[in-house]
């Protein structure tokens, strides 16, 4: 048996509502194949995601407590580091020691103070959100993988809240028309939302400010909505949409109003890294929608794409339900982990 050179520690997540775990039993086994690696898991770390302490022990990990991990691990893996856990992450930050590596989601663009705090403690932080969207880093691209899960789950939230069934059905009483679903933003989350809504039988349309998104929308069976706007420079690095000026957004909202008033479900997914989410759906636009319609705002944590969104709440305005879910991937913790 080789000499232990690196101890990797996985503490239980303490961020409220976080049910994911940073390392699954299957990946414990993969890491232990490397010489000199020891893995310590806090007892109960994987329970909320469906992984028992026994699963970790069988994979070769050692069960321990939180203090042992922060005292002795050279590398600490967390889903929500103190940078993204602003509720009670300070207690973990205070436990970190010089020379340690902290790997996880740190929200560095919105929380620069955390990066400074790590530097002062001589702790090296790896912000998984900043890993570029390239082939070599694909297995560590947490933004894309979590966005895929969020796009899937937001459609289920919409279907559950809607007064209508998604698919067309022929019944003895007559024909029930399929629901019309409109997805705003055709990134990873938006495309997955399109695909999921299509599988449920809805008529799906989608819009993205990036011209290149048209083919992607078609590839998942949705119909691209095209607006009379100049979008030549709408795409930034890494394939993400660039923030647009207020004049552009105002014109976009005027044109979009005519589209969404016909929809049964609207899903918004537009987010700008490190910045407040752009307002795509105004209160006036909501009032033009049919009673019983549903809006699911996946950008709720960054202020929301809808004027009326309240993070973590469901608001009813003029008979329209506006759902502002937060940390959606955590609601599917097994696969998200």
Model-based region annotation:
Residues 11-48, 167-261:
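Glycine-rich phosphate/diphosphate-binding loop of Rossmann-like nucleotide-binding domains
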Residues 129-171, 300, 305-337:
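Adenosine-phosphate binding glycine-rich loop
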Residues 28, 53, 115, 155, ...:
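Generic hydrophobic/aromatic pocket-lining and core-packing "Φ" positions
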Residues 109, 149, 187-188:
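Residue-level detector of alpha-helix initiation sites
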Residues 60-74, 82, 234-266, 270-283, ...:
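A structured beta-alpha segment of the ubiquitous adenosine-cofactor-binding alpha/beta core
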Residues 85-86, 189-196, 207, 214-215, ...:
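Short glycine/serine/threonine-rich phosphate/pyrophosphate-binding segments
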Residues 4-117, 121:
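An N-terminal-biased, well-structured beta-alpha scaffold segment characteristic
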